[in-house]
Each structure stands twice: as structure tokens, then as C-alpha cells.
């Protein structure tokens, strides 16, 4: 779950000790068809930003960076196409789109992980974390153990794990 979104579900879900996405000098990216200043995206200036969700850490970081802006909700893997077609002036990219946007001729306006690091003296940008339903009670330690073992297996068998994960990569 996104760290921003976690605030809205913390009464029902607990953050787990294992597994998180932290952007260290890298994070969600704001892209556009053409160069523009981020202040051009501020609310009331006639520009719209495609975002992957209102509760995403990417949206919160973009708001902190830009200030308030006009936006539309677009499925994260459709944002590059929506920006390329001109449906939006810019977009906040997460996941694979962060790596492939240049192939569509889009330009980087800001890497929010880099921006966050500059603003915070080098702290990583908290993006997402693994959660477990609080009502699972006595099962939570078992879920935690299994997740820890899965992560350890992936780290011990990186080539096999990456090959498997690439099967789920959209556009990679």
C-alpha cells in the first residue's frame, strides 16, 4: 500500500516489518510532451496533470513539490499514453513508466525522489509498504515469517527472482 494511502487504512491494516519501497535518489517522475517549468502546472494556470491515484505517495510528493494543481485520475500504466496524446499536459509516472517514458518522446520535468532527497538532506522518499489485516490476529506472525523468507529467497537467488519478476513487467 502507498505510504500516503496507509494513513487512511491504518485502523484496519498494520505495516509489516518486511518489504517497502523507498526512493533513494529515484522516485516517481513528472513528465510532459515538452519542457515546461513546474510552476506552469500550478492550479489555475490551465494545465492538467495525470496522476495514478489520490492516495498515492506519488500524488502527495507531487503536491509537495508543485503545490496545488488540477489533475485527473488515470490508471498508472496509461499515463504515458494520455500525456503523449495530449489529453493531459503532464503526468506523474510510477512503476515501469518511470523507465520507459523517453521511448514515447516524453521529457522529464522532475524526478520526485531526487527532489525529495534535496529537500530533506538525502532522506529516501517513502513510497509503499507491505501491510497485513489487523483482524488476522494470531496469523500475523506467520504471514510476517513467510514474507521475510520470501524476501530472503529472492535476495539469495537474485537472477532467478529477477527473471521471474520480469514476467510481470509491463513494457519492459
What are these regions (language model features)?
Residues 1-35:
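Glycine/small-residue-rich interface belts in oligomeric ring/scaffold proteins
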Residues 2, 55-56, 150:
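Short linear Ser/Thr-Pro motifs
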Residues 8-12, 62-63, 100-103:
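Short loop/helix-cap segments at secondary-structure boundaries that form the rim of catalytic
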Residues 14, 70-72, 107:
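Conserved beta-strand segments of alpha/beta enzyme cores
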Residues 22-40, 64, 117-135:
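Hydrophobic/proline-rich hinge and linker segments of small-molecule sensing/allosteric domains
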Residues 28-89, 96, 163:
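Bilobed "Venus flytrap"/periplasmic-binding protein-like clamshell domains
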Residues 74-165:
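Pocket-lining segment of extracytoplasmic ligand-binding domains
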Residues 167-172:
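Short glycine/proline-rich, acidic loop/turn segments that cap or connect secondary-structure elements
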Amino acid at each position: 500500500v502507498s505510504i500516503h494511502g496507509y494513513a487512511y487504512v491504518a485502523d484496519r491494516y498494520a505495516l509489516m516489518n518486511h518489504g517497502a519501497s523507498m526512493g533513494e535518489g529515484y522516485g516517481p517522475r513528472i513528465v510532459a510532451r515538452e519542457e515546461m517549468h513546474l510552476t506552469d502546472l500550478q492550479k489555475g494556470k490551465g494545465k492538467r496533470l495525470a496522476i495514478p491515484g489520490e492516495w498515492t505517495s506519488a500524488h502527495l510528493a507531487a503536491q509537495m513539490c508543485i503545490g496545488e494543481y488540477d489533475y485527473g485520475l488515470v490508471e498508472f500504466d496509461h499515463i504515458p499514453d494520455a500525456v503523449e496524446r495530449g489529453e493531459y499536459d503532464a503526468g506523474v509516472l510510477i512503476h515501469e513508466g518511470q523507465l520507459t517514458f523517453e521511448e514515447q518522446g516524453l521529457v522529464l520535468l522532475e524526478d520526485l525522489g531526487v527532489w525529495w532527497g534535496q529537500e530533506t538532506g538525502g532522506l529516501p522518499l517513502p513510497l509503499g509498504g507491505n501491510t497485513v489485516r489487523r483482524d488476522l490476529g494470531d496469523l500475523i506472525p506467520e504471514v510476517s515469517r513467510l514474507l521475510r523468507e520470501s524476501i530472503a529467497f529472492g535476495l539469495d537467488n537474485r537472477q532467478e527472482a529477477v527473471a521471474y519478476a520480469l514476467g510481470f513487467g509491463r513494457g519492459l
